[in-house]
């Protein structure tokens, strides 16, 4: 049996719409991501467990794990009969790279089980293609960090899919999932088709400034550049509380930045002072979480990405 874990991720990181993404890991050592277990069988089967498995499609053909299995077999020209178990630990349509977790975990597991017929680049391109079946367009800002770990700059149109961006060791990321769904399709539908020239210039300056600051270890500049003028002004209205209200309350409690994780509704809060984390988490728990499905996790950067947990 092969068991693979794929971590949750924060896409966009505020300033990098469809361009930045990072894998995250809870600092308490728990796992925040999906697990896939596969073993040889006489016929294909797929079963799902985990806290959020009830959110998955009922029809097998609509399950992204099944679609990944079918596509993998198609590429290799051979049908592999496997028993697959999905542990669905990331809520669907949460902004934490839920579909990427499942896609990355199953493709890494299948590739390893079958003797690694696909190399890293081939796997990554396949992951992006399968992600496109969920979101409607091929993109890598979740699958790339989920697969390879770290913070990633996506250069999709340059034939160099991603590059590693260094981060800051003392940064901690509070992620707050309110317990409601916002699909990527709905979240994208509220964005304008065109942006003002001034917004485009400002966005370019913030993004390039952030990447430069990370490489040159200028923390103050990186924080100043974490501004989202592409998505936040339009998506914030979909959330239980507008991000401006969240920002006001968490900044006065010691946070250094906050933003939308992916398409939302999860928000991230960035801190470099560990003493303020408890107060900020308490506020988010009281005012942002909407039901018992919501949760808050204190995370750091996950530099490992997808990994094999069991191989026997």
Swiss-Prot record:
GO MF entry, a single one: ATP binding
Coarse class of the protein's main subcellular location: cytoplasm
One GO-annotated biological process of the protein: threonine biosynthetic process
Keywords: Amino-acid biosynthesis, ATP-binding, Cytoplasm, Kinase, Nucleotide-binding, Threonine biosynthesis, Transferase
Domain of life (superkingdom): Bacteria
Catalytic activity, EC: 2.7.1.39
Residues given in the record as ATP binding sites: 91-101
Catalytic activity field: L-homoserine + ATP = O-phospho-L-homoserine + ADP + H(+)
Family matches, as SUPFAM superfamilies: GHMP Kinase, C-terminal domain (SSF55060), Ribosomal protein S5 domain 2-like (SSF54211)
Pathway in which the depicted protein is active: Amino-acid biosynthesis; L-threonine biosynthesis; L-threonine from L-aspartate: step 4/5
PANTHER family linked: HOMOSERINE KINASE, HOMOSERINE/4-DIPHOSPHOCYTIDYL-2-C-METHYL-D-ERYTHRITOL KINASE
Sequence similarity: Belongs to the GHMP kinase family. Homoserine kinase subfamily.
Protein name, as recorded: Homoserine kinase
Protein's gene: thrB
């Amino acid at each position: 049996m092969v068991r693979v874990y794929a971590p949750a991720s924060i896409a966009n990181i505020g300033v990098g719409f469809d361009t930045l993404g990072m894998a995250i890991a809870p600092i308490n050592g728990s796992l925040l991501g999906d697990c896939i277990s596969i073993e040889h069988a006489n016929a294909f089967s797929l079963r799902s467990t985990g806290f959020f498995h009830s959110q998955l499609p009922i029809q097998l053909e609509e399950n992204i794990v099944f679609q990944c299995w079918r596509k993998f077999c198609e590429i290799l020209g051979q049908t592999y009969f496997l028993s697959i178990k999905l542990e669905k630990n990331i809520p669907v349509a949460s902004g934490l790279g839920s579909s990427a977790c499942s896609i990355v975990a199953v493709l890494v597991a299948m590739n390893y089980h079958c003797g690694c017929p696909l190399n890293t680049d081939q796997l990554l391109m396949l992951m992006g293609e399968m992600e496109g079946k969920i979101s409607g367009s091929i993109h890598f800002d979740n699958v790339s960090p989920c697969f390879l770990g770290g913070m990633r700059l996506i250069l999709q149109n340059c034939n160099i899919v991603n590059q590693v961006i260094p981060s800051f060791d003392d940064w901690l990321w509070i992620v707050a999932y309110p317990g409601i769904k916002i699909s990527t399709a709905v979240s994208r539908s509220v964005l304008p088709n065109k942006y003002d020239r001034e917004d485009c210039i400002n966005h370019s300056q913030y993004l390039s400034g952030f990447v430069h600051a990370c490489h040159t270890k200028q923390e103050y500049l990186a924080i100043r550049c974490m501004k989202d003028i592409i998505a936040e002004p339009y998506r914030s209205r979909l959330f239980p509380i507008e991000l401006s209200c969240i920002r006001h309350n968490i900044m006065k409690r010691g946070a250094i930045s906050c933003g939308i994780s992916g398409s939302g509704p999860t928000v991230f809060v960035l801190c470099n002072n560990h003493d303020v984390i408890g107060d900020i988490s308490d506020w988010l728990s009281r005012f942002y979480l909407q039901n018992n499905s919501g949760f808050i996790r204190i995370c750091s950067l996950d530099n490992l990405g997808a990994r094999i947990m069991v191989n026997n």
